[in-house]
Swiss-Prot record:
Keywords: DNA damage, DNA repair, DNA replication, Ligase, Magnesium, Manganese, Metal-binding, NAD, Zinc. InterPro entries: BRCT_dom (IPR001357), BRCT_dom_sf (IPR036420), DisA/LigA_HHH (IPR041663), DNA_ligase (IPR001679), DNA_ligase_AS (IPR018239), DNA_ligase_CS (IPR033136), DNAligase_adenylation (IPR013839), DNAligase_N (IPR013840). DNA ligase that catalyzes the formation of phosphodiester linkages between 5'-phosphoryl and 3'-hydroxyl groups in double-stranded DNA using NAD as a coenzyme and as the energy source for the reaction. It is essential for DNA replication and repair of damaged DNA. It comes from Pseudomonas paraeruginosa (strain DSM 24068 / PA7) (Pseudomonas aeruginosa (strain PA7)). Its cofactor is Mg(2+); Mn(2+). Belongs to the NAD-dependent DNA ligase family. LigA subfamily. It is an enzyme of class 6 (ligase). Pfam families: BRCT, DNA_ligase_aden, DNA_ligase_OB, DNA_ligase_ZBD, HHH_2, Nlig-Ia. GO terms for biological process: DNA repair; DNA replication. NAD(+) binds at D35, A36, E37, Y38, D39, S84, L85, E126, R149, E186, K302, K326. This is DNA ligase. It comes from the Bacteria.
Length: 794
C-alpha cells in the first residue's frame, strides 16, 4: 500500500468517525468522547489533508461546521454563516495567531511590514462559555426569531424556546439600535442552576444530565417550550451577524452597545493590546475559572476594530481575526483497568476506578471515584471499558461515561465484595427507615457498609484522623501517618485511647524525639476541653458536618439533650431534615457509639465539654399543636386540617380522646380525614410515639405550652456576611467563627441579600459582584475594628 493509499484510507476513517461524533454531539446531544479527543482527531485530519491536498473534498468535516438540524424543528438559513473559531492550545499557537494578524494588517498598522512588525493590535477578550451557540434576530427592536447554529449555514428555529430565557430581552431597551440586528451568543446553564436541575430530577426520579453544556443543549431543544421555560437557562452575547443600520466600529464598542440595549454580555469582557496582554488575561481567567458561576473551556480573543476584521476576512470554516485559546482538557479518554474497594470511617465500602494513566488538566490521573454501586450501575460500567474521565479544579477525578462503541468483548461486570477487603467482616447494604403517613417502611440505600466498626482498621484509622482534624478536636501534630502508626502498633483502638498515651509509647514512634513527643502530648492535653460543637463534629455522625454540629450545640445546649433527642424533635431545628434527624438519633441510640462516647468522657482521662447548658431562647415554645399534628404525617391530615383539630381540641390529649362523633363535629374536616385520624390513633404504637414526642418537647421547653424566653439580640443577628480573599490576622475559618458568634450567618456566595463582604488581598469575583450590587465591603482592618467594637478578641 502506497503512502497516498494509506492516507486516503485514514482520511476516510477519520471523516466517518468525526461525522458520527458530530451527529451525537449536535443532534442527539449525547457526546461519546471528550472535546479534547475530537480536537485531536480533527487536527489529524487537517494535517493529512494538508499533506495530500488532492484528497480534499467539499464534504470533509474540515470544510464545514459540524451538525445537522433535527427534523422536528423548522429550518433557518443563516444569511451570514455562523462559523466556528480556530483553536490555540499552546502559548506558541497564540503568538502565531498574533503574528498572522499583524502580517495581514501590515499595510494598516503604523510601522507595519510583511514580517509582522509594527504596532501591537488591540484585542477583545472574554471567557469561552461552554453552551450552545444561537442567533437572535431583532426587527425594529422586537425579537422575531431565535435559531441554533446547526451546521453553520442552516440551523433550527427555536424562537418559542429562546423567548422563555429570562435574560433574553423580547424588546430592546433604549434607542439607537439598527432596524435589523442579528445578535449571536451562547445559551448556557450556570453551575448552581445545573446542580438544582439535577437535584430536582433525582427527587422526581427523572433523568440527570452529565454536565451543564448537555443540560443547556437538551433544554433548549425541547419541542415543548414549557419544559424549556422550567430550566435555568441564560444567554450571553458575543457578536453579531446580519445588520441593517449602523453599529460602533469596534468589537468592544458593539458589545457595550448591546449591554445598553438590554442584551447580556460577559462581565469579564476586557480590551487589551498585544499578545502578552492576551496571555495575561488567559492566565487570570484560568486562575479564577473555578470561582466563576458558569463552566468555560477557554477564552476568546478577537481583533477589536471591525475594519481590521473585514480586512483579515475568513478561511474555510473560521475567521482569521479571532481565536479560542483552550484550557488544558478536563476530560480525557482512558481504559478502566480494574476496581478496588476502599473502606471509610463510617464503614462505607466505596468502589474506586483504577485507570490506565492519562494526563487530565495537566495532572496524571490513574484513579477516579465511582461514588457507590448505584453509580456503577447507572454508568453501565465494566472492567475493560473505555471511559471519559473528568477533572475540574481540586475535585477528585470522576468517571463521567462509558464509550460503548469501544467496549471489548471480554469486559467484566463489577461486583461488590461480600466481605470487607480490610478486616474480613460482612459487607451489608444499608437499609433506610422511612416514616410517612403513620407507616414505617424499609428501602435499600446506595451505600454498602462493613459491619466491623472500630475493629476494622480502615474504619478506625479514618475515624481517628477525622477526630483529631483541625475543625474537630484540633490536635496539632497528629497527622495521618502518625495515626496509622498508633493503630498498627495497637496503641489506639478507640478515640479515647489517645488520652491515655504515655511518653514512652509516643517516643518510640518513627520520627519522634523528646521535643516532638512532648509537643504531641501537650496538644492532646490541650484538646481535653473542646466546645460542644467541635466534639459533636469530631464524633463523625453521618451527614453531620461542621455547620450542623454548631447548630445542634447552639440549639440544644448539651450532649445529653442531643443524644436523646427524638428525630421528630430534631426536625424543629432549621436545616435539619428527616433523614439527617434519623442519622443523628440512630447514632446516639447505637450501643457501640454510646460506649465510645462514655470512654471519651471518662472523668479521669477523658474530655470535659464546654457546654452551654440550655436550649436556645429562640426554640422556647417553638412548637405549635397544629405543627405537631402536621409532623405526625397522618394520611389526609394536611396543615389546614391540623389547624382545625388544634383549634377544636386545644391539646394532644383532647385529640387522642376524641371519638368519631367529636371528630365529625370539627368544622369542614373531611370524613376521610376524620377516619384516617381515628385509624392512626387506634394503633397503640402511634399514640405512644406521639406522647413521647410531646413529653420531650415539654422537657426541652419547646412545647406550645412552655414559657417563651426573651431573646437577647446579637449585634449581627439576621445579617448574612461573606468572606473572600486572604486574611493575615486570622484564618477565614476563625473569622467565620467570630462573625457567627455575633449572630451573623456566613455564606459562601454573594447575593442581593448579603449585608457585608469582608475582602482581603486576592479577592476576586465575589468582591466584583459585591461592588456591582453596591454592597457594604470591609477590608481586614475594618473587620478587626468591628470585632474590637463588640469586644471580641482576635
Amino acid at each position: 500500500m502506497t503512502d497516498t493509499q494509506a492516507a486516503a484510507e485514514r482520511i476516510a476513517q477519520l471523516r466517518t468517525e468525526l461525522d458520527t461524533h458530530n451527529y451525537r454531539y449536535y443532534v442527539l446531544d449525547e457526546p461519546s468522547i471528550p472535546d479534547a479527543e475530537y480536537d485531536r482527531l480533527f487536527r489529524e485530519l487537517q494535517a493529512l489533508e494538508a499533506e495530500h491536498p488532492q484528497l480534499l473534498t467539499p464534504d470533509s468535516p474540515t470544510q464545514r461546521v459540524s451538525g445537522t438540524p433535527a427534523s422536528a424543528f423548522g429550518e433557518v438559513r443563516h444569511e451570514i454563516p455562523m462559523l466556528s473559531l480556530g483553536n490555540a492550545f499552546e502559548e506558541q499557537d497564540l503568538l502565531d495567531f498574533d503574528r498572522r494578524v499583524r502580517e495581514g494588517l501590515a499595510d494598516l498598522l503604523p510601522g507595519g511590514d510583511l514580517l509582522g512588525g509594527g504596532a501591537e493590535v488591540e484585542y477583545s477578550c472574554e471567557p469561552k462559555l461552554d453552551g450552545l451557540a444561537v442567533s437572535l434576530l431583532y426587527e425594529n427592536g422586537q425579537l422575531v426569531r431565535g435559531a441554533t447554529r446547526g451546521d453553520g449555514s442552516t440551523g433550527e428555529d427555536i424562537t418559542s424556546n429562546v423567548r422563555t430565557i429570562r435574560n433574553v430581552p423580547l424588546k430592546l431597551h433604549g434607542e439607537g439600535w439598527p432596524d435589523i440586528l442579528e445578535v449571536r451568543g451562547e445559551v448556557f446553564m450556570s453551575r448552581a442552576g445545573f446542580e438544582a436541575l439535577n437535584a430536582k430530577a433525582v427527587e422526581t426520579g427523572g433523568k440527570t444530565f452529565a454536565n451543564p453544556r448537555n443540560a443547556a443543549a437538551g433544554s433548549l431543544r425541547q419541542l415543548d417550550s414549557k419544559i424549556t421555560a422550567s430550566r435555568p437557562l441564560e444567554f450571553c452575547a458575543y457578536g453579531f451577524g446580519r445588520v441593517s443600520g449602523t453599529l460602533p466600529d469596534t468589537q468592544v464598542g458593539i458589545l457595550e452597545a448591546f449591554r445598553g440595549w438590554g442584551i447580556p454580555i460577559s462581565r469579564e469582557l476586557r480590551l487589551v493590546k498585544g499578545a502578552q496582554a492576551c496571555r495575561d488575561y488567559y492566565d487570570d481567567i484560568g486562575r479564577r475559572r473555578d470561582a466563576l458561576a458558569y463552566e468555560i473551556d477557554g477564552v476568546v480573543f478577537k481583533v477589536n476594530r471591525i475594519a481590521f476584521q473585514r480586512e483579515l476576512g475568513f478561511r474555510a470554516r473560521e475567521p482569521r481575526w479571532a481565536i479560542a485559546h483552550k484550557f488544558p482538557a478536563r476530560e480525557e479518554l482512558t481504559e478502566l483497568l480494574g476496581v478496588e474497594f476502599q473502606v471509610g470511617r463510617t464503614g462505607a465500602v466505596t468502589p474506586v476506578a483504577r485507570l490506565k494513566p492519562v494526563q487530565v488538566a495537566g495532572v496524571t490521573v490513574s484513579n477516579a471515584t465511582l461514588h457507590n454501586m448505584d453509580e456503577v450501575a447507572r454508568l453501565g460500567l465494566r472492567i475493560g471499558d473505555t471511559v471519559v474521565i473528568r477533572r475540574a479544579g481540586d475535585v477528585i477525578p470522576q468517571v463521567m461515561q462509558v464509550v460503548l462503541e469501544r467496549r471489548p468483548a471480554d469486559a467484566q461486570p463489577i461486583e461488590v465484595p461480600e466481605h470487607c477487603p480490610v478486616c474480613g467482616s460482612a459487607v451489608e447494604r444499608t437499609q433506610l427507615v422511612r416514616r410517612s403517613k403513620g407507616r414505617e417502611s424499609l428501602s435499600e440505600g446506595a451505600i454498602y457498609r462493613c459491619v466491623g466498626r472500630l475493629s476494622c482498621q480502615a474504619q478506625l484509622k479514618q475515624a481517628i484522623i477525622h477526630f483529631v482534624s483541625r475543625r474537630a478536636m484540633d490536635i496539632d501534630g497528629l497527622g495521618d501517618k502518625i495515626v496509622e502508626q498508633l493503630v498498627d502498633r495497637g496503641l489506639v483502638a478507640s478515640p479515647a485511647d489517645l488520652y491515655t498515651l504515655t511518653y514512652d509509647q509516643v517516643f518510640e514512634l518513627e520520627g519522634f524525639a523528646e521535643l516532638s513527643t512532648n509537643n504531641l502530648l501537650a496538644a492532646i492535653a490541650d484538646s481535653r476541653t473542646p466546645s460542644l460543637a467541635r466534639f459533636i463534629f469530631a464524633l463523625g455522625i453521618p451527614d453531620v458536618g461542621e455547620e450542623t454540629a454548631k447548630l445542634l450545640a447552639r440549639s440544644l445546649g448539651s450532649l445529653e439533650r442531643i443524644g436523646k433527642a427524638l428525630p421528630e424533635v430534631l426536625t424543629y431545628l432549621p436545616d435539619v431534615g428527616a433523614e439527617v434527624a434519623y442519622e443523628i438519633h440512630n447514632f446516639f441510640a447505637d450501643e457501640h457509639n454510646r460506649q465510645v462516647i462514655a470512654q471519651l468522657r471518662d472523668a479521669e482521662h477523658g474530655v470535659q465539654l464546654q457546654e452551654e447548658g440550655e436550649v436556645a431562647a429562640e426554640f422556647a415554645a417553638c412548637a405549635s399543636l397544629a405543627g405537631f399534628i402536621d409532623k405526625l404525617n397522618i394520611p389526609f391530615i394536611a396543615a389546614t386540617g391540623a389547624e382545625k383539630l388544634a383549634s377544636r381540641f386545644g391539646s394532644l390529649d383532647g385529640i387522642i380522646r376524641a371519638d368519631w362523633l367529636d371528630l365529625r363535629q370539627v368544622e369542614r374536616l373531611p370524613e376521610r380525614a376524620a377516619k384516617s385520624l381515628r385509624d392512626f390513633l387506634d394503633e397503640p404504637a402511634n399514640v405512644q410515639r406521639a406522647l413521647a414526642i410531646e413529653a420531650q418537647l415539654r422537657e426541652f421547653g419547646m412545647h406550645w405550652q412552655s414559657e417563651r424566653k426573651a431573646v437577647e439580640g446579637l449585634p449581627l443577628a439576621g445579617q448574612t456576611w461573606v468572606l473572600t480573599g486572604t486574611l493575615e490576622a486570622m484564618s477565614r475559618d476563625v473569622a467565620k467563627e467570630k462573625l457567627e458568634g455575633l449572630g451573623a450567618k456566613v455564606a459562601g456566595s454573594v447575593s442581593a441579600r448579603t449585608h457585608c463582604v469582608v475582602a482581603g488581598p486576592g479577592a476576586g469575583s465575589k468582591l466584583a459582584k459585591a461592588n456591582e450590587l453596591g454592597l457594604k465591603v470591609l477590608d481586614e482592618d475594618g473587620l478587626l475594628k468591628l470585632l474590637d467594637e463588640y469586644g471580641v478578641a482576635h
